[in-house]
Each structure stands twice: as structure tokens, then as C-alpha cells.
Amino acid sequence: MSVIKMTDLDLAGKRVFIRADLNVPVKDGKVTSDARIIASLPTIKLCLEAGAKVMVTSHLGRPTEGEYAEEFSLQPVVNYLNDALDCEVKLAKDYLDGLELNAGELVVLENVRFNKGEKKNDEELSKKYAALCDVFVMDAFGTAHRAQASTHGVGMFAEVACAGPLLAAELEALGKAMSNPERPLVAIVGGSKVSTKLTVLESLSKIADQLVVGGGIANTFIAAEGHNVGKSLYEADLVETAQKLMKECAIPVATDVACAKAFDENAEAEIKHVSEVQDDDMIFDLGPDSTAALAEIIANAKTILWNGPVGVFEFKNFEAGTKGISEAIAQSPAFSVAGGGDTLAAIDKFGIKADVSYISTGGGAFLEFVEGKVLPAVEMLEARAK
């Protein structure tokens, strides 16, 4: 993957436009989870230390495009940056006709979705963004799968378009896990539905040595082996697809499961062999034998790709499977990459953040990369590097 890297450029005195992912949750005007801002800070600091004139922007939430709405303003992010950095950070609301900046100064450009044409990758808007800068830095992996004016169009017209450190690290880690993995490669795919992860499963079945399935997805595979799944979430119309995937790749299917009669966090977990599941049972997690078997597979892996929990880990009585998988990944010396919103929540809950080699910041972008799709922002950066 050949792209220009920001770290290879001399940014002194240059106008630098960073497209970051600062789409953070905000409550009562305060940032409630700062993970994405923290991930972007090194890029911002590098530019400031290099003596660049720095502009950083992002989307936040889903405002009506082209209309200002205070609840979607980046002002809370500006307030956070003012506390986190040694310089004064201002918010620019009207910036499309140009800005005056000094070297070492940082300005946050208001939510890009307040600009009409942002989502449609409007050429005129893209050119206005490009006119603001000498160097465009794409550093938002989380939106790299969307061709929008601030993630794609601007890069087509900017004098120089490059990958920021966060994006470059993300591409490198995912490339290491997928393009040239040390084997065995074990892929873990959880989540509620096969249909939403079907392309991921198909893509990974071709490259993984073992494909571990969990959550509602696993129920469809249990049904594909001819077992009753009771009232569990599963997709009857995809049983044949599951059977086909099992012929193409080693997919260890659960032998025991944790069930209950109702979807309730206080419901008692009943451990059953898969052949004993009743018509009124609902499967919410892997059983201890299945968890132990998967932990052993993970222990022998050299590369691990993890997307999605393997049970309803939000409920104390049904967290054991995801906890067991998490701990096995944490203890494994393998190169591990994890991504997807629920996966990150599980990593936080079980405290294994420091033990995962790389945690992806992208939800949809992570999945599309794993599906083998070309990400528009990356395609643009490759084209501009030629």
C-alpha cells in the first residue's frame, strides 16, 4: 500500500488541514468519552511542533446537512483541546472563504456536516477545503470507507495529500494481520446476525486457518449442524450458507451453551450440551467446554483478528464466553488486531487493552477493510502518491 506519509514531510510554515475522527459522545456540552481525541493528539502535536499552521476538523453526530445546530458543534472538543494542549485553540465557524493562521497555531474547523455537499463529496466544497491548505492529512480511519468532501474530495484537489500517523498505523496493522499473516491465523467473528457479517465471514473463510464464530451468528452455525436452537436469535434462511462456509474453512462450532428462558440480565444461565437445547430456550453465550476449546485455539495462533463478542457479555450471567476469549487473546503472544464498537466495549470491560497488539479505531471501515473492499480515502491517497 503506497501512500505519502505525513511523517515524511517538512511541515514548517505550511498550512495543514487534518481530517481527524473527533466524533465523540457529548452530554451537557462535555465530552463523555475522549478515546478518539486522545488517538488524534499525537498527529496534532507533531504538526504544531513542526511549526505548521494547523487546521483540524471532523464530523460529529448526524446533523441536517447544511444547517448549524449547537448540539452537533465541535465546541466541546475545542474546550477539551484547550485543556489538553499548551496552546490556545479556537473554533472557526466560517472558514470556507479562507483563514489567516500563524505558524504553531491550531484552529478547529466547525463540523464538516454543517457544510452543504459534504456527504455527496461535492466538487466545489472539496475545492474550497483544498484551497485552505498546502497539505491535506487524512487521519480518520473511522470514515475512510466514506467518499465525502472532507475525507476524499479535498485530497483530490489539495497540493499534497498524505496519510496521518493514525491512519498509517491502522493500515499497517490490518495489512500485517491480513495480507501477510504469520500462521496460524485465527479470526473471531461475533455479533448478532450472519447477514450483516456475511461478506466478512466469506472473506475471512478464504484466509483464516480457523474461523471462530460467536453470538447470534454462532446459533445459525449450531442450527446448521442440525441442532435445535429453540427461541434463540438465528437466521434459518442462512443455514445453508453456514454449511457451505463450514466446508470451506475450519469453523469450530460450540458443543455446549449458556441458555435462559428470557432475555433478562437477571436470568440464570443454564449450561447445556447443544443437543439438549429445548424449544423454549434462548442461547446467550458459549458454555465452559466451548470457551476452553476456543481459548486453546487462540493460544496456538500466531495472528488473531477479532471482531465482535461471542455472547451477551453486557449481562453478568452471560459474560463468561467473551471474558474467556478476551483473556486468551490477552495471554497469547500472537499479533492481535481487534475492531468494532462492541469489541472495544468488551476490551474495556475485561481490562485487556494493553494486551491487544492493535485496536482499530474504525467500525464500518474496519469491517470493509476485512471484507477486502477498497476504502475510498485510501484509494485517493494511493492515487495521489503516484
Swiss-Prot record:
Binding site for ATP: 197, 314, 340-343
Pfam families xref list: PGK
Main location: cytoplasm
Keywords associated with the record: ATP-binding, Cytoplasm, Glycolysis, Kinase, Nucleotide-binding, Transferase
Gene Ontology cellular component terms for the protein in this record: cytosol
Reaction equation(s) it catalyzes: (2R)-3-phosphoglycerate + ATP = (2R)-3-phospho-glyceroyl phosphate + ADP
Metabolic or biological pathway, per its Swiss-Prot or TrEMBL entry: Carbohydrate degradation; glycolysis; pyruvate from D-glyceraldehyde 3-phosphate: step 2/5
GO biological process annotation, one example: gluconeogenesis
Molecular-function GO term, any one: phosphoglycerate kinase activity
Subcellular location: Cytoplasm
SUPFAM superfamilies: Phosphoglycerate kinase
Binding site for substrate: 21-23, 36, 59-62, 113, 146
Enzyme Commission number: 2.7.2.3
InterPro entries assigned to the protein according to its UniProt record, in alphabetical order: Phosphoglycerate_kinase, Phosphoglycerate_kinase_CS, Phosphoglycerate_kinase_N, Phosphoglycerate_kinase_sf
Assembly notes: Monomer.
Record-stated family: Belongs to the phosphoglycerate kinase family.
PANTHER family recorded: PHOSPHOGLYCERATE KINASE (PTHR11406), PHOSPHOGLYCERATE KINASE 1, CHLOROPLASTIC-RELATED (PTHR11406:SF23)
Record protein name field: Phosphoglycerate kinase
Organismal lineage: Bacteria, Pseudomonadati, Pseudomonadota, Gammaproteobacteria, Vibrionales
Gene (name only): pgk
